[in-house]
């Protein structure tokens, strides 16, 4: 898919289709008024006849509008003027792309980016249009023998900006939107891959493939033998029941002018399949536990976006690849593990395994002397109960970092909600036999999981994103969402100091 930006009048556009907005009730947007004027009232006559009310998402495709150079004009309902919000805007873009694909238009000039969206600027509107378009066109059919094909798929979109001075802003928005979309695409592809293909070695191979095409990226892998030497006993215990080797993949991106600048570290939980281990999960929907590597998929996707944007910062991404399976060699409830940090953990439930993998990785990253560390994981079902499918859970021991991530979520539309990390919750992890348990009980499950992780992050500023509710969808639209790539990518853009404002 090719994207570009222009600034110009609709009557001068020669394209397969022009896309313009209509407000409710039957009010033409400024661009639609220009088309109506040159067509001598053709469009307003149709609206007076009741062909389109202007409700959000309504579509009316016109052919051969008088005096208009383009073959088609697509009128898009945008709701009431000045009330268009970001959610409606993205829904309208999605519906527009679907309609354009059905018409067989291979290219279109879209003026929806000139609409007023509450609290949003040109950069946001263009970038979200790119990302929403790419997301709506995504399909995972790599393993299908019969692939569905659009008659004449949309290949080129031109987004219009109001003035020529905004062209540079629009071009930057397209650049960033394409990069984030590429990251989301990779995230979704890796996460949607079945667990008999996507194991820890596969995760590592995807990272190595990326390094082959990006000079600033170096990838190394750490297998079980080296983990044992490092004392990563907690991580190793989780993978003991699987015939697939646990592999930690380290992706080092050096983009800063000073290569010695402290790196930002992103850690992704990479349980390529989580059966629960000896504490076996119920059979219903267990197939979706291939998505328990959603954190690692988000990190590799964010690293892809980072490489595409060529941001001037140093970032390390870690994919904590592992598989939690039951066997005679599996770790058990009642086991006491000595973590890489030296702290001991009593295992109460082998299905609370993500934190046992992450705690050793969070200790391992101390060697990088990081500027900050963000881990992302499909960690707890409790977070899904608390926040549903719309917001990721955010926990942090550092207020400025938490505020940065919340802001990045609002900017990108990949929002998070901060949860408490109060000292009172730590008592729920007490064990009579070890320094802590790996389970705090049913109440406040996502909070006690984050409290557990916080005990391994004392040497740097840290935040934890629980994406259990946001990394994938179930039901009819089953599949990876591509989150948390947008929030992580936006955070890195903000940290890099790249100018994006008008």
Swiss-Prot record:
Its cofactor is Mn(2+). Transmembrane segments: none annotated. One of its GO terms (biological process) is proteolysis. It catalyses: Release of an N-terminal amino acid, Xaa-|-Yaa-, in which Xaa is preferably Leu, but may be other amino acids including Pro although not Arg or Lys, and Yaa may be Pro. Amino acid amides and methyl esters are also readily hydrolyzed, but rates on arylamides are exceedingly low; Release of an N-terminal amino acid, preferentially leucine, but not glutamic or aspartic acids. Keywords: Aminopeptidase, Cytoplasm, Hydrolase, Manganese, Metal-binding, Protease. Signal peptide: none annotated. Mn(2+) 1 binds at residues 274, 351, 353. It comes from the Bacteria. The active site is at 281, 355. One of its GO terms (molecular function) is metalloaminopeptidase activity. InterPro entries: Leucine_aapep/pepB (IPR011356), Macro_dom-like (IPR043472), Peptidase_M17_C (IPR000819), Peptidase_M17_leu_NH2_pept (IPR023042), Peptidase_M17_N (IPR008283). It is an enzyme of class 3 (hydrolase). Presumably involved in the processing and regular turnover of intracellular proteins. Catalyzes the removal of unsubstituted N-terminal amino acids from various peptides. Belongs to the peptidase M17 family. This is Probable cytosol aminopeptidase. It comes from Shewanella denitrificans (strain OS217 / ATCC BAA-1090 / DSM 15013).
